[in-house]
């Protein structure tokens, strides 16, 4: 048993060495950071149990990473250490207890806390205030000379500002790529047909390690200082945080979220606050770094083989994890779009257990090169739908199966088609397709459409399965007696649905248009159509040229609208609904008594609203004349930011867009 465990330890070492090279040298990691951290923790646990098995080449005895041969090597005068990790409050408390136990006479209560940036660690050497050398961390002892590349980073001062700086000082920090810059860089790459970067860290590392510094100069890199190495000429403050402030006076940027806090509970509060605002920050982070602030205590605590005893990285729950792709199911939406859905071995990621992930379309499957049975990297960040971001092809065993996109609808077996220039494959069956019929009816009765109370998804599915309804108009022919044949449907519930259907007959032209499910016609577009044309008849007979005069309607949407109303079966559906008694007041009357202070304004909602739903807020803003969009641009006039607002708020701040709160919104309404 002991022999097999020692053999497993050797295999674990080899795996960690391999993945360290992929991460640090090739900038092309195969596994998520969380998986690497788990493997390292397992290695260290075995070594703690069997210290006689520890070897000098163990990953636990060094930082990790190898210097590239293509750059001149630099030896660090003081090793650039990595950090140990904590993944829970208990592990954080253990770290602090160990430090206090080593120095029982010291009162360890002040901590310098900062976000853990996801970039590349670098060392900047200044002599007489002038930048003379920049180097990567490398293996902690030897790094690569990247001076010419670092000189291109605007936030790195080539000469220190102010006065009183040491004759020689080494400043350590992180080179990273802000989210906005990363998105722009990838947008340019896509337009050129070039390979895009997987994440900002890879983009930063790849940019910094260019042999041609002219290429680096075109990349949107930034730098934040986080510590000091060699210092000659003067003595710096004995407070880590005060050293930050001194560096800032000399022109070296520090992360604005960095704080000096007192006590364990304040450290936990800092962690919780940064975790809550993670998606809103303009850069990628994967945790927070907690350092004992007193430099004297730091020096006395010292370090272990690969990390200081006075600092720790408190990591966030992983946003990426490894799991197995067990199968792929193909779902059909209301417009016939066929979407491949990955069925995964359940995995806890981003704070929830994930068992399904979108694969988007056939192009995405081909791009990933993914197969059933593969080990895949799954990502879930914030409220984003989980998705597969890469495949660990090195873990293939040979029994994986290719994913075959269907040539006929998986529900109705109609022929599938893919229009040139579109990524989506669609079922051609229309309402003949039971799946499309279900989704079309769910959309028709949804809150933003006809808003039929009590007519939920399960009821719709039963109605279609039992062939009780085929088109939206059929819903209005249902009686309470007929509805009681459905599962869990008593006479009272059935009558409530009939009553709700009768109430829903009185609607607005905008809601009616939206309920029809015309491709690309959302709430805002439907409202614009209603305001512009005033009547259903005018919209039905509008030409392509007339449609593109409507705000928010371009060539593609105009084609979808004309095609919809030109289709004979759609004409019959609309006519049947009118015959069932659906009515709306003249459009002119809707806004005649409502002031429109936001007429012509482009508005964006972001964050969590506590007093009203996002849908209600959007509808109310549109009634006030606003055009509500989903993204922030130079054309945006106002951003209404709720709690935990994310990247949209950050972008608005960068563009100088007017920002208002939920209270401002409520006052306006």
Curated annotation (Swiss-Prot):
NAD(+) binds at residues 33-37, 82-83, 114, 137, 174, 291, 315. It comes from the Bacteria. PANTHER family: CHROMOSOME TRANSMISSION FIDELITY FACTOR 18, DNA LIGASE. It catalyses: NAD(+) + (deoxyribonucleotide)n-3'-hydroxyl + 5'-phospho-(deoxyribonucleotide)m = (deoxyribonucleotide)n+m + AMP + beta-nicotinamide D-nucleotide. Its EC number is 6.5.1.2. Residues 593-669 form the BRCT domain. HAMAP family: DNA_ligase_A. The active site is at 116 (n6-amp-lysine intermediate). It is an enzyme of class 6 (ligase). Its cofactor is Mg(2+); Mn(2+). NCBIfam families: dnlj, PRK07956.1. Zn(2+) binds at residues 409, 412, 427, 433. One of its GO terms (cellular component) is cytosol. One of its GO terms (molecular function) is DNA binding. DNA ligase that catalyzes the formation of phosphodiester linkages between 5'-phosphoryl and 3'-hydroxyl groups in double-stranded DNA using NAD as a coenzyme and as the energy source for the reaction. It is essential for DNA replication and repair of damaged DNA. Keywords: DNA damage, DNA repair, DNA replication, Ligase, Magnesium, Manganese, Metal-binding, NAD, Zinc. This is DNA ligase. One of its GO terms (biological process) is DNA replication. Belongs to the NAD-dependent DNA ligase family. LigA subfamily. CDD domains: BRCT_DNA_ligase_like, LIGANc. InterPro entries: BRCT_dom, BRCT_dom_sf, DisA/LigA_HHH, DNA_ligase, DNA_ligase_AS, DNA_ligase_CS, DNAligase_adenylation, DNAligase_N. SMART domains: BRCT, HhH1, LIGANc.
């Amino acid at each position: 048993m002991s022999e097999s465990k020692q053999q497993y330890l050797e295999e674990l070492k080899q795996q960690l060495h391999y993945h360290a090279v992929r991460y640090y040298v090739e900038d092309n990691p195969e596994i998520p950071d969380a998986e690497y951290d788990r493997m390292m923790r397992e290695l260290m646990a075995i070594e703690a149990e069997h210290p006689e098995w520890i070897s000098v080449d163990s990953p636990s005895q060094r930082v990790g990473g190898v210097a590239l041969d293509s750059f001149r090597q630099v030896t660090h005068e003081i090793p650039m250490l990595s950090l140990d990790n904590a993944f829970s409050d208990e592990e954080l408390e253990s770290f602090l207890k160990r430090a206090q136990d080593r120095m029982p006479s010291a009162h360890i209560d002040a901590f310098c806390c900062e976000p853990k940036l996801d970039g590349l660690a670098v060392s900047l050497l200044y002599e007489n205030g002038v930048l003379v050398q920049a180097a990567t961390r490398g293996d902690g002892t030897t790094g690569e000379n990247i001076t010419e590349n670092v000189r291109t980073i605007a936030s790195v001062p080539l000469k220190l500002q102010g006065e009183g700086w040491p004759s020689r000082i080494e400043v350590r920090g992180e080179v990273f790529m802000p989210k906005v810059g990363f998105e722009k860089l990838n947008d340019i790459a896509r337009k050129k047909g070039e390979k895009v970067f997987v994440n900002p860290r890879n983009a930063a590392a790849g940019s910094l390690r260019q042999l041609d510094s002219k290429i680096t100069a075109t990349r949107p890199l930034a730098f934040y200082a986080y510590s000091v190495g060699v210092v000659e000429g003067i003595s710096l403050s004995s407070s880590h945080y005060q050293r930050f402030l001194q560096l800032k006076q000399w022109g070296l940027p520090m992360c604005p979220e960095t704080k000096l806090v007192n006590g364990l509970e304040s450290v936990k509060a800092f962690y919780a606050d940064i975790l809550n605002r993670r998606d809103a920050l303009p850069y990628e982070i994967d945790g927070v770094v907690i350092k004992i602030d007193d430099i004297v205590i730091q020096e006395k605590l010292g370090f272990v083989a690969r990390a200081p005893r006075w600092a720790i990285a408190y990591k966030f729950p992983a946003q990426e994890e490894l799991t197995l792709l067990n199968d792929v199911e193909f779902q059909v939406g209301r417009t016939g779009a066929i979407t491949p859905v990955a069925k995964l071995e359940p995995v806890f990621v981003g704070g929830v257990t994930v068992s399904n992930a979108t694969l988007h379309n056939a192009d995405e499957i081909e791009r990933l090169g993914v197969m059933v049975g593969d080990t895949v990297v799954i990502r879930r960040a914030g409220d984003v739908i989980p998705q597969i971001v890469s495949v660990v092809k090195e873990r293939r065993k040979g029994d994986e199966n290719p994913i075959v996109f269907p040539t006929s609808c998986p529900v109705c077996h109609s022929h599938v088609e893919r229009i040139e220039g579109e990524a989506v494959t669609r079922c051609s069956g229309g309402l003949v397709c039971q799946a499309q019929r279900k989704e079309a009816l769910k959309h028709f009765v949804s809150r933003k459409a006809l808003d039929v109370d009590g007519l939920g998804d399960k009821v719709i599915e039963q109605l279609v399965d039992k062939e009780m309804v085929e088109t939206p108009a059929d819903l209005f022919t249902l009686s309470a007696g007929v509805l009681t044949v459905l599962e869990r449907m008593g006479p009272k519930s059935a009558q409530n649905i009939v009553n709700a259907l009768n109430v829903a007959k009185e609607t607005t032209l905008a809601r009616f248009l939206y309920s029809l499910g015309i491709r690309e016609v959302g709430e805002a577009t439907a409202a614009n159509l209603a305001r512009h044309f005033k009547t259903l008849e005018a919209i039905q007979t509008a030409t392509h040229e007339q449609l593109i005069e409507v705000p928010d309607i371009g060539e593609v949407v105009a084609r979808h609208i004309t095609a919809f109303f030109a289709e004979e079966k759609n004409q019959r559906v609309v006519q049947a609904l009118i015959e069932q008694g659906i009515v709306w007041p003249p459009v002119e009357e809707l806004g005649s008594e409502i002031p429109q202070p936001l007429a012509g304004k482009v508005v964006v909602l972001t964050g969590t609203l506590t007093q009203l739903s996002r849908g209600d807020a959007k509808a109310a803003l549109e009634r006030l004349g606003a055009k509500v969009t989903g993204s922030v641009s130079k054309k945006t006039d106002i951003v209404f930011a709720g709690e935990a607002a994310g990247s949209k708020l950050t972008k608005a701040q960068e563009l100088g867009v007017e920002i208002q709160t939920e209270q401002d919104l409520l006052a306006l309404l």
